[in-house]
Amino acid sequence: MAQMYFYYSAMNAGKSTTLLQSSFNYQERGMNPAIFTAAIDDRYGVGKVSSRIGLHAEAHLFNKETNVFDAIKELHEAEKLHCVLIDECQFLTKEQVYQLTEVVDKLNIPALCYGLRTDFLGELFEGSKYLLSWADKLVELKTICHCGRKANMVIRTDEHGVAIADGDQVAIGGNELYVSVCRRHYKEALGK
Protein backbone atom coordinates (compact mmCIF):
# COMPACT_ATOMS: atom_id res chain seq x y z
CA MET A 1 0.00 0.00 0.00
CA ALA A 2 1.53 3.28 -1.13
CA GLN A 3 1.83 6.23 1.24
CA MET A 4 2.48 9.96 1.08
CA TYR A 5 5.48 11.27 3.02
CA PHE A 6 6.27 14.86 3.93
CA TYR A 7 9.93 15.53 4.72
CA TYR A 8 10.08 19.07 6.07
CA SER A 9 12.63 21.36 7.64
CA ALA A 10 14.12 24.82 7.72
CA MET A 11 16.57 25.70 4.95
CA ASN A 12 19.92 23.91 4.63
CA ALA A 13 18.86 20.65 6.26
CA GLY A 14 19.54 18.52 3.18
CA LYS A 15 16.03 18.09 1.76
CA SER A 16 17.18 18.03 -1.87
CA THR A 17 20.14 15.81 -0.99
CA THR A 18 17.80 13.34 0.70
CA LEU A 19 15.44 13.43 -2.31
CA LEU A 20 18.30 12.73 -4.71
CA GLN A 21 19.56 9.87 -2.52
CA SER A 22 16.05 8.36 -2.49
CA SER A 23 15.88 8.62 -6.27
CA PHE A 24 19.27 6.92 -6.58
CA ASN A 25 18.17 4.12 -4.24
CA TYR A 26 15.12 3.39 -6.41
CA GLN A 27 17.19 3.47 -9.61
CA GLU A 28 19.85 1.23 -8.10
CA ARG A 29 17.14 -1.41 -7.61
CA GLY A 30 16.01 -1.12 -11.23
CA MET A 31 12.97 0.98 -10.36
CA ASN A 32 11.69 4.12 -12.05
CA PRO A 33 11.25 7.24 -9.90
CA ALA A 34 9.85 10.51 -11.25
CA ILE A 35 11.21 13.77 -9.84
CA PHE A 36 9.19 17.00 -9.86
CA THR A 37 10.23 20.48 -8.76
CA ALA A 38 8.66 23.92 -8.69
CA ALA A 39 9.06 25.89 -11.92
CA ILE A 40 9.44 29.06 -9.82
CA ASP A 41 12.83 27.91 -8.46
CA ASP A 42 15.36 28.02 -11.30
CA ARG A 43 18.45 28.94 -9.25
CA TYR A 44 20.35 25.90 -10.54
CA GLY A 45 18.78 25.72 -14.00
CA VAL A 46 15.31 24.99 -15.32
CA GLY A 47 14.03 21.50 -14.63
CA LYS A 48 16.77 20.53 -12.20
CA VAL A 49 16.95 19.50 -8.57
CA SER A 50 20.33 20.40 -7.11
CA SER A 51 21.80 20.07 -3.65
CA ARG A 52 24.38 22.27 -1.99
CA ILE A 53 26.84 19.35 -1.97
CA GLY A 54 26.81 19.10 -5.76
CA LEU A 55 24.29 16.34 -6.50
CA HIS A 56 21.72 17.06 -9.19
CA ALA A 57 19.10 15.42 -11.41
CA GLU A 58 16.66 16.36 -14.14
CA ALA A 59 13.10 17.01 -12.99
CA HIS A 60 9.63 17.60 -14.35
CA LEU A 61 8.27 21.04 -13.52
CA PHE A 62 5.06 22.02 -11.78
CA ASN A 63 3.45 25.40 -11.35
CA LYS A 64 0.14 26.47 -9.84
CA GLU A 65 -1.75 25.39 -12.97
CA THR A 66 -0.26 21.88 -13.22
CA ASN A 67 -2.65 18.99 -12.67
CA VAL A 68 -0.21 16.83 -10.74
CA PHE A 69 -2.40 13.72 -10.92
CA ASP A 70 -2.70 13.93 -14.72
CA ALA A 71 1.03 14.63 -15.18
CA ILE A 72 2.03 11.65 -13.04
CA LYS A 73 -0.61 9.36 -14.54
CA GLU A 74 0.68 10.18 -18.04
CA LEU A 75 4.26 9.32 -17.05
CA HIS A 76 3.07 6.15 -15.30
CA GLU A 77 1.15 4.99 -18.38
CA ALA A 78 4.23 5.54 -20.57
CA GLU A 79 6.55 3.68 -18.17
CA LYS A 80 5.59 2.27 -14.78
CA LEU A 81 6.56 4.59 -11.93
CA HIS A 82 7.69 3.17 -8.60
CA CYS A 83 7.63 6.48 -6.73
CA VAL A 84 7.18 10.21 -7.19
CA LEU A 85 9.59 12.64 -5.52
CA ILE A 86 8.52 16.27 -5.16
CA ASP A 87 11.10 18.95 -4.34
CA GLU A 88 10.05 22.41 -3.12
CA CYS A 89 6.63 20.94 -2.24
CA GLN A 90 5.75 23.98 -0.13
CA PHE A 91 4.82 25.60 -3.46
CA LEU A 92 2.06 23.06 -4.18
CA THR A 93 -1.51 24.29 -3.93
CA LYS A 94 -4.16 22.66 -1.76
CA GLU A 95 -5.65 21.08 -4.90
CA GLN A 96 -2.27 19.70 -5.98
CA VAL A 97 -1.68 18.12 -2.57
CA TYR A 98 -5.12 16.52 -2.90
CA GLN A 99 -4.12 15.30 -6.37
CA LEU A 100 -1.04 13.69 -4.81
CA THR A 101 -3.30 11.82 -2.39
CA GLU A 102 -5.10 10.51 -5.48
CA VAL A 103 -1.77 9.40 -6.99
CA VAL A 104 -1.09 7.44 -3.80
CA ASP A 105 -4.61 6.07 -3.31
CA LYS A 106 -5.70 5.39 -6.91
CA LEU A 107 -2.41 4.71 -8.73
CA ASN A 108 -0.72 3.09 -5.69
CA ILE A 109 2.46 5.13 -6.23
CA PRO A 110 4.31 6.41 -3.15
CA ALA A 111 4.75 10.19 -3.04
CA LEU A 112 7.80 11.55 -1.20
CA CYS A 113 7.49 15.31 -0.74
CA TYR A 114 10.34 17.55 0.44
CA GLY A 115 9.97 21.18 1.44
CA LEU A 116 9.88 23.98 3.94
CA ARG A 117 7.30 23.93 6.69
CA THR A 118 7.09 27.69 7.25
CA ASP A 119 8.10 30.92 5.56
CA PHE A 120 10.27 33.74 6.94
CA LEU A 121 7.30 35.08 8.91
CA GLY A 122 6.72 31.73 10.62
CA GLU A 123 3.56 31.10 8.58
CA LEU A 124 2.76 27.80 6.88
CA PHE A 125 3.04 27.62 3.11
CA GLU A 126 -0.17 26.38 1.45
CA GLY A 127 1.42 23.15 0.26
CA SER A 128 3.01 22.49 3.64
CA LYS A 129 -0.25 23.12 5.47
CA TYR A 130 -2.08 20.42 3.53
CA LEU A 131 0.85 18.01 3.53
CA LEU A 132 0.95 18.30 7.33
CA SER A 133 -2.78 17.53 7.32
CA TRP A 134 -2.95 14.75 4.74
CA ALA A 135 0.43 12.98 4.58
CA ASP A 136 0.61 9.46 5.96
CA LYS A 137 4.07 10.04 7.43
CA LEU A 138 5.72 13.25 8.64
CA VAL A 139 9.51 13.35 8.89
CA GLU A 140 11.40 16.35 10.22
CA LEU A 141 14.88 16.81 8.75
CA LYS A 142 17.05 18.74 11.14
CA THR A 143 19.61 21.48 10.76
CA ILE A 144 21.26 23.68 13.35
CA CYS A 145 21.24 27.33 14.37
CA HIS A 146 24.52 29.21 14.81
CA CYS A 147 24.08 28.63 18.59
CA GLY A 148 24.01 24.85 18.14
CA ARG A 149 20.31 24.35 18.87
CA LYS A 150 17.89 22.87 16.35
CA ALA A 151 16.97 25.43 13.68
CA ASN A 152 13.25 25.34 12.98
CA MET A 153 12.72 28.89 11.68
CA VAL A 154 14.03 30.89 8.73
CA ILE A 155 14.83 34.59 8.63
CA ARG A 156 15.01 36.58 5.42
CA THR A 157 17.75 39.18 5.29
CA ASP A 158 18.28 42.32 3.25
CA GLU A 159 21.45 43.08 1.26
CA HIS A 160 23.19 44.06 4.53
CA GLY A 161 22.33 40.83 6.35
CA VAL A 162 19.65 42.47 8.52
CA ALA A 163 16.50 40.42 9.22
CA ILE A 164 13.36 41.75 7.54
CA ALA A 165 9.80 41.17 8.71
CA ASP A 166 7.73 42.03 5.65
CA GLY A 167 7.50 41.28 1.95
CA ASP A 168 6.06 38.66 -0.36
CA GLN A 169 5.87 35.14 1.02
CA VAL A 170 7.95 33.82 -1.87
CA ALA A 171 11.37 35.21 -2.75
CA ILE A 172 13.64 32.62 -4.32
CA GLY A 173 17.10 32.55 -2.83
CA GLY A 174 19.64 30.64 -0.85
CA ASN A 175 22.21 31.48 1.80
CA GLU A 176 22.50 35.05 0.48
CA LEU A 177 18.87 35.71 1.43
CA TYR A 178 17.87 33.24 4.16
CA VAL A 179 19.33 31.99 7.44
CA SER A 180 18.01 29.01 9.42
CA VAL A 181 17.82 29.72 13.15
CA CYS A 182 16.24 28.43 16.36
CA ARG A 183 13.02 30.04 17.57
CA ARG A 184 14.86 32.12 20.19
CA HIS A 185 17.21 33.67 17.64
CA TYR A 186 14.33 34.12 15.18
CA LYS A 187 12.49 36.22 17.76
CA GLU A 188 15.64 38.16 18.65
CA ALA A 189 16.41 38.89 14.98
CA LEU A 190 12.92 40.27 14.43
CA GLY A 191 12.82 42.14 17.74
CA LYS A 192 9.95 40.03 19.13
From Swiss-Prot:
Q: Provide a Gene Ontology MF annotation, just one.
A: zinc ion binding
Cross-referenced InterPro entries: P-loop_NTPase, Thymidine_kinase, Thymidine_kinase_CS
Provide the residue positions that the database annotates as binding ATP.
Answer: S9, A10, M11, N12, A13, G14, K15, S16, D87, E88, C89, Q90
Q: Where is the active site?
A: E88 (proton acceptor)
Q: Which reaction does it catalyse?
A: thymidine + ATP = dTMP + ADP + H(+)
User: Which PROSITE patterns does the record associate with it?
Assistant: TK_CELLULAR_TYPE
Domain of life, source organism: Bacteria
Enzyme Commission number(s) from the entry: 2.7.1.21
Mention any one GO cellular component term assigned to this protein in its UniProt record.
cytosol
Pfam families the record matches? TK
Q: What is its main location?
A: cytoplasm
The signal peptide here is: none
User: What interactions and quaternary structure are annotated?
Assistant: Homotetramer.
The record's comment on protein family reads: Belongs to the thymidine kinase family.
Instruction: State what protein this is by name.
Output: Thymidine kinase
